[in-house]
């Protein structure tokens, strides 16, 4: 995410009157509270529930190089490391960028790896250039597959990926890590997207557009990945590793241009969350700086044709979508990174849409910059990660 992308997590004050009105309505509707499960994580961006009932959490990293991590959380909030040392570095907007979305299928965990330090801010606001120094990892802007047994998940105290093995993965090798006690994990590169493409601007020809994989979902032998930097969804053939663009989302007019100093005349789409429903893909579009309310949407994508139609409109910084089927009917949980005004100073929300046309019910308004959500149906708990390092639990029985 560059200055007009999801990587920018800047805060700014917003209209007090609008905030009071919106949050009063939210408080009247919200029926759930956020119970902290854990804090102190390294900026968690992705979660997935394993078939052992544990919550797997991707942590994009700290200011330290290669501090990306996958953690295992039990229902009591006890944390163990599954894999540390994943690629992570400070990106072009001075934020850590590393592991992002997770998707678990059987005993294979798919992990999106963000853009890292591939780019740097250009000399003109809103521009990006290639990093003039050496990029710290050859597998930024990629997807990894991590295989591990149920016993390893139950007993491991953690593995660390050596820096040298990042190059081995880039070269197409499968990396096996063992702790000497019979536990091991196997890691392979599923897809390595172009780090960037040329994107010349009339006033700055060297400008580039960065690839920034964010969330992902698998359907049969295809993996679909949102890219918040390139404003598209990738499709990956899991049998061959080949990938192509399924759909690209165009920019829209910025309704706050000339009113809020930040941002240009148009808003990038910034696709974030992705899920499947009725053989279609649902993708949240976060939208770019200054993140105006009402411009964020959930899009419905036909995976056979790439046809894109708006499914839920009028949102604010939608970052995840979760379809829930009950008695042959489907309702939709939408996670908003913030609720009112430009930027992110307002609380995040979980909204429940019985119909795409709304209006939604506010499930929870007790969130601070949430990033993703995972439902444990058996426990009746919705887990939500927050950018500041927390995972919270929200009671939710569909």
Feature annotation, model-predicted:
Residues 35-38, 78-86, 153-194, 244-258, ...:
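Beta-propeller fold detector
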Residues 73-78, 147-151, 237-241, 301-306, ...:
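Short loop/turn segments that connect beta-strands within beta-propeller blades
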Residues 56-58, 110-113, 225-226, 282-285, ...:
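Residue position within the beta-strands of beta-propeller blades
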Residues 18-29:
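C-terminal segment of classical bacterial N-terminal signal peptides
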Residues 66-71, 142-144, 232-234, 296-300, ...:
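A short loop-to-beta-strand structural motif that recurs across blades of beta-propeller domains
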């Amino acid at each position: 995410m560059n200055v007009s992308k999801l990587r920018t997590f800047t805060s700014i004050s917003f209209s007090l009157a609008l905030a009071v009105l919106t949050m009063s309505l939210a408080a009247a509707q919200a029926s759930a509270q956020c119970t902290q499960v854990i804090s102190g994580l390294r900026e968690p961006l992705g979660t997935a529930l394993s078939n052992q009932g544990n919550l797997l959490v991707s942590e994009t990293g700290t200011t330290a190089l290669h501090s990306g991590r996958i953690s295992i959380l039990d229902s009591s909030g006890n944390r163990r490391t599954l894999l540390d040392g994943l690629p992570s570095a400070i990106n072009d907007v001075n934020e850590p960028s590393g592991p992002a979305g997770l998707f678990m299928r059987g005993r294979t965990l798919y992990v999106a790896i963000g853009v890292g330090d591939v780019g740097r801010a250009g000399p003109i606001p809103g521009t990006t250039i290639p990093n003039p120094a050496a990029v710290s990892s050859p597998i930024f802007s990629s997807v990894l597959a991590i295989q591990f047994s149920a016993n390893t998940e139950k007993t491991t105290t953690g593995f660390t990926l050596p820096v040298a093995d990042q190059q081995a993965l880039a070269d197409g090798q499968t990396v096996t890590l063992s702790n000497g006690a019979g536990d091991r994990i196997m890691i392979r590169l599923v897809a390595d997207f172009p780090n960037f493409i040329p994107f010349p601007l009339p006033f700055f020809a060297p400008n580039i557009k960065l690839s920034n994989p964010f969330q992902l979902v698998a359907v049969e032998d295809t993996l679909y990945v949102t890219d918040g930097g390139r404003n598209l969804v990738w499709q990956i053939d899991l049998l061959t590793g080949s990938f192509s663009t399924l759909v690209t989302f165009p920019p829209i007019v910025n309704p706050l241009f000339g009113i809020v100093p930040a941002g240009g005349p148009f808003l990038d789409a910034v696709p974030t969350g992705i899920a499947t429903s009725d053989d279609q893909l649902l993708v949240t579009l976060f939208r770019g700086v200054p993140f105006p309310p009402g411009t964020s949407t959930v899009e419905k994508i036909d995976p056979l044709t790439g046809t894109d139609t708006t499914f839920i409109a009028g949102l604010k910084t939608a970052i995840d979508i979760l379809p829930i089927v009950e008695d042959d009917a489907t309702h939709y949980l939408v996670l908003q990174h913030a609720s009112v005004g430009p930027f992110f100073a307002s609380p995040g929300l979980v909204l429940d849409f019985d119909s795409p046309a709304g209006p939604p019910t506010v499930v929870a308004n007790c969130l601070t910059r949430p990033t993703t959500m995972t439902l444990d149906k058996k426990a009746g708990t919705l887990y939500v990660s927050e950018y500041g390092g927390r995972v919270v639990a929200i009671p939710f029985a569909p």
